[in-house]
């Protein structure tokens, strides 16, 4: 049988060997509505990706959320920014045919308060909501758990690669009056990077002074600490590029498309590859957090960017505000590889050798031909970032 076309994205250095761990078999799909699901979305689609369990009492996530473990939320709203209301801090969420909630585990509800999916398509397994928590929501698409988990594996590889790349950024020229020895990366002057957040098992983040980023691509805040706390402080920004960060970034004000702070939300990266526990206590974190091994205990405050964590527990009205990392800039110098794994349709543990595939680019040009080896695997050469199909 001719394999179905598969569309993939190559992200920088990617996920190399991961960008697709394609298992060539067709999962069953059941639609509970006539809504057209275009796919499970790429990593830039999600406001939060949780590789374990998620719980919430109050608060919300303004954008889409993906949860690989179980979800237990009360008094909570998903894609709150879909309303476009005046109280939304992040960018408005628009339904483009990708999940507003992607759930691989079970849906639970240990308290009586409401749980609201404001808009969009919920994607989960048929066993996820046995208690009918979403019984009145008719925009649900059911997928096999293996297909959903494959998407999380893709995301995890991307997040790990971001952390590896962040660890390679170094500076020996800190900018005066800025926090944590932030200075230009020695290899890429378009990136600022911290130099005083490593070598500690625990790290407390209080007031943070950030340099102007009008002519920079990113600020990388990298720490190898295992325990991190955001508390008793604010993030201040050198808005006018005068050499002093005096403007407090207002992380609770309604979204303003002309705010000078918007560029910060897409350019600041908090890279915590070794973190096991992160706490926020009423703190407005600016930028995206990459901590796939950490349990994030968020008590009030917000994260104004994407959230990539092992577990997420929201209390005290904590909110995820709908801002995304500028992935296009982060990936612009990257390449990646594609790995294909061919398995038997009736026994996914049986790998098949000799299967032939073509990798086709966006111009419908065959850029490489692959054949699986005795392990049922084939790996492409380095490919530029872009959209590809496997035929």
Q: Which positions does each model-derived feature cover?
A:
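Long, polar low-complexity repeats
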Residues: 33-112, 158-334
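Hydrophobic beta-strand residues in large extracellular and virion-surface proteins
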Residues: 71, 101, 122, 191-192, ...
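Secretory-pathway luminal glycosyltransferase catalytic domains
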Residues: 3-4, 132-182
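Solvent-exposed loop/turn and edge beta-strand elements of beta-rich ligand-binding domains
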Residues: 7, 130-133, 144, 148, ...
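Sec-dependent N-terminal signal peptides of Gram-positive bacterial secreted proteins and lipoproteins
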Residues: 4-28
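N-terminal, intrinsically disordered, polar/charged segments of Gram-positive cell-envelope systems
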Residues: 31-32, 357
């Amino acid at each position: 049988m001719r394999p179905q076309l598969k569309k993939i994205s190559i992200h920088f250095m990617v996920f190399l060997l991961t960008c697709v761990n394609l298992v060539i078999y067709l999962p069953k799909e059941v639609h509970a509505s006539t809504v057209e699901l275009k796919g499970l979305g790429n990593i830039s689609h999600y406001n939060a990706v949780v590789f374990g369990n998620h719980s919430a009492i109050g608060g919300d996530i303004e954008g889409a959320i993906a949860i690989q473990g179980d979800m237990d939320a009360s008094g909570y709203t998903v894609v709150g920014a879909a309303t476009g209301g005046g109280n939304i801090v992040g960018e408005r969420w628009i339904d483009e045919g990708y999940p507003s909630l992607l759930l691989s585990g079970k849906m639970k509800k240990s308290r009586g308060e409401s749980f609201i999916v404001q808009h969009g398509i919920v994607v989960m397994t048929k066993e996820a909501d046995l208690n009918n928590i979403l019984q009145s929501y008719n925009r649900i698409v059911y997928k096999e758990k293996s297909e959903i988990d494959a998407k999380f594996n893709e995301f995890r590889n991307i997040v790990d690669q971001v952390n590896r790349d962040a660890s390679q950024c170094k500076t020996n020229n800190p900018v005066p009056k800025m926090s944590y020895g932030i200075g230009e990366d020695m290899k890429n002057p378009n990136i600022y990077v911290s130099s005083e957040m490593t070598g500690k098992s625990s790290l407390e983040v209080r007031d943070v002074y950030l340099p102007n980023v009008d002519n920079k691509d990113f600020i990388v805040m990298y720490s190898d600490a295992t325990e991190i706390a955001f508390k008793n402080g604010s993030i201040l920004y050198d808005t006018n590029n005068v050499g002093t960060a005096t403007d407090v970034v207002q992380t609770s004000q309604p979204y303003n498309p002309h705010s000078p702070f918007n560029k910060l939300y897409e350019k600041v990266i908090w890279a915590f590859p070794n973190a096991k526990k992160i706490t926020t206590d009423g703190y407005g974190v600016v930028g995206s957090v990459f901590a796939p091994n950490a349990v994030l205990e968020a008590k009030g405050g917000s994260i104004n960017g994407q959230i990539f964590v092992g577990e997420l527990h929201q209390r005290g009205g904590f909110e995820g505000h709908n801002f995304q990392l500028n992935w296009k800039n982060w990936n612009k110098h990257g390449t990646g590889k594609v790995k294909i794994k061919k398995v038997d349709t009736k026994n996914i543990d049986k790998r098949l050798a000799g299967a032939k595939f073509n990798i086709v680019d966006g111009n419908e040009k065959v850029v490489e031909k692959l054949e699986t080896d005795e392990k049922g695997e084939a790996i492409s050469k380095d490919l530029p970032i872009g959209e590809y199909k496997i035929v």
